[in-house]
Amino acid sequence: MLGFTNIDDKGQEGIELGWQDILAGKSGSRRVIKDRKGRIVEDIESILKSKPGKDIALSLDSKIQYRAYRELKLAMDTHKAKAGGIVVLDSQTGEVLALVNLPTYNPNNRTGRNGRKARNRVLTDIFEPGSTMKPFTVASALEAGKIKPDTEFNIAPGTITIGRRTIRDAHAVSIEEGLVTVEQVIQRSSNVGTVKISKLLPAQTMWETLNNSGFGASTGSGFPGEVKGMLHLPPWRPIRQATMSYGHGIAVNLLQLARAYTLFSEEGKLKPVSLLKIDTPPAGEQVISRKTALAVSKMLEMVVAKGGTAPLAQIEGYRVAGKTGTTHKVKAGGGYEKKKYVAS
């Protein structure tokens, strides 16, 4: 996150590079007379006044940052993951309270630093978000008036065919259990249900919801090397629209995804993110209606309740909302790895 400087104290990575001009200031110049030994004997005039560097205050909370690091390391050790990232946002202000990447390195000891450890994965790496994209498909359909939270879909037998491709839910669905509401589609994370919802939408409508939610564009964090992700413009083939509805064929960075989810806690408003402390929180832009945001937020609370995909995320005494997502890792030459995953 902080990055480092070179021997001349010029920022090379991270915050040090992104805010170099503010931190370093600018050198000045003056006209002088020197004696034959190079000593200044008379100051003639100032040509350019110097500007001292300024301090900046990061929005990071040291306690949250440490706990995020500790929990990420524990989760990676438990699940034997090769890499991971956590970002914590204040949804009311857009401030980044914690941003953690592993593996990492000690900037005070550069002997162990390499490209794999040095890059800020939260901002510079993209991944297919998988089922974490389903709430945005539902939000788009709610906004368009195509569905209501209690609209029912039949997802039995747990498969749906689009052209020559068959899309499956994680588990087979019996005829008796096949009729589910939109709320249950999100709660159970049904691919089939989400695809059926997406088929009610024009591609342009779905794209506009995703684009307005910040996907396919920079978050504006100012961090060097931040990627925009990938969001294809319509028109889409039916199979692309189907797979995008549950988070395949679209790529995001972790900060983009976290920022987009603040829509549901901020009654449909999207605010810019900031790595620096801000005095006056921005008003934000209304992306979806308050009614839609509250409806989806309720569905996300069902995800972490009994019957959802993440009941262990419940915290006694607190309202918790969330969404799980799992995708196969994309191969370098195309296609997907069979036994390598990205989990959100």
Language model feature labels by segment:
Residues M1-G53:
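Small/polar-residue-rich segments within soluble enzyme cores
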Residues T5, D55, T280-A283:
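Short, polar/charged loop or turn motifs at beta-strand boundaries
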Residues D9, L72-T93, N101, I126, ...:
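Flexible, solvent-exposed loop/hinge segments and secondary-structure transition points
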Residues L17, Y66, R70-K73, E208, ...:
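Solvent-exposed alpha-helical segments within well-ordered globular domains of core cellular machineries
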Residues G25-R30, G84-G85, P238:
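Extracytoplasmic/periplasmic mature domains of Sec-exported, cell-envelope-associated bacterial proteins
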Residues S27, H79-A83, N154:
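Short, small/polar residue-rich loop motifs at catalytic or cofactor-binding pockets
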Residues D35-E45, L60, S91-S131, F136-S344:
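Beta-lactam-recognizing serine transpeptidase/beta-lactamase-like catalytic domain environment
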Residues V41-G84:
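Conserved, well-ordered alpha-helix/loop/beta-strand core segments that scaffold catalytic motifs
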